[in-house]
């Protein structure tokens, strides 16, 4: 598992412009990520997803996030997430460790 503190820095640098993680956090360009783990794609209440996200039908967890965060548009063709991805596996592991903690508090 990755390093939560390093993951928080990655989130602030690469994700926080479009996403929030706290319970009751607002949707921005991207959805609030609270409760992400164990939720199916395209299911955050009140966020307008593309059909690609709604129809992907996978459940978010460490393995699915590891693959998605490497190249979001390859994993879910048609997603409106414009982020290019994180190529370094260690950085993805750190981010996932942070998300696992932060989206569950």
From Swiss-Prot:
Mod. after translation: Binds 1 heme c group covalently per subunit. Phosphorylation at Tyr-49 and Tyr-98 both reduce by half the turnover in the reaction with cytochrome c oxidase, down-regulating mitochondrial respiration.
Tagged with keyword Transmembrane helix: no
Transmembrane segments: none
Modification N-acetylglycine occurs at: 2
Annotated positions of the N6-acetyllysine modification: 73, 100
Compartmental location: Mitochondrion intermembrane space
Induction profile: Induced by lipopolysaccharides.
One Pfam family of this chain: Cytochrom_C
Tissues/organs with expression: Found in embryos and in adult liver and heart.
InterPro entries: Cyt_c-like_dom, Cyt_c-like_dom_sf, Cyt_c_1A/1B
PROSITE patterns recorded: CYTC
Any one GO biological process: mitochondrial electron transport, ubiquinol to cytochrome c
Purpose: Electron carrier protein. The oxidized form of the cytochrome c heme group can accept an electron from the heme group of the cytochrome c1 subunit of cytochrome reductase. Cytochrome c then transfers this electron to the cytochrome oxidase complex, the final protein carrier in the mitochondrial electron-transport chain.
UniProt protein name: Cytochrome c, somatic
Gene name of the record: Cycs
């Amino acid at each position: 598992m990755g390093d939560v503190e390093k993951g928080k820095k990655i989130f602030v640098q690469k994700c926080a412009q479009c996403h929030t993680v706290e319970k009751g956090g607002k949707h921005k360009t991207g959805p609030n990520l609270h409760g992400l783990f164990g939720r199916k794609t395209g299911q955050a209440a009140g966020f307008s997803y593309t059909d690609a996200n709604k129809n992907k039908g996978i459940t978010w967890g460490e393995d699915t996030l590891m693959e998605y965060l490497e190249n979001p548009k390859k994993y879910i063709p048609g997603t409106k997430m414009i982020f290019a991805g994180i190529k370094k596996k260690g950085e993805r592991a750190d981010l996932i460790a942070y998300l696992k903690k932060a989206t569950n508090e």
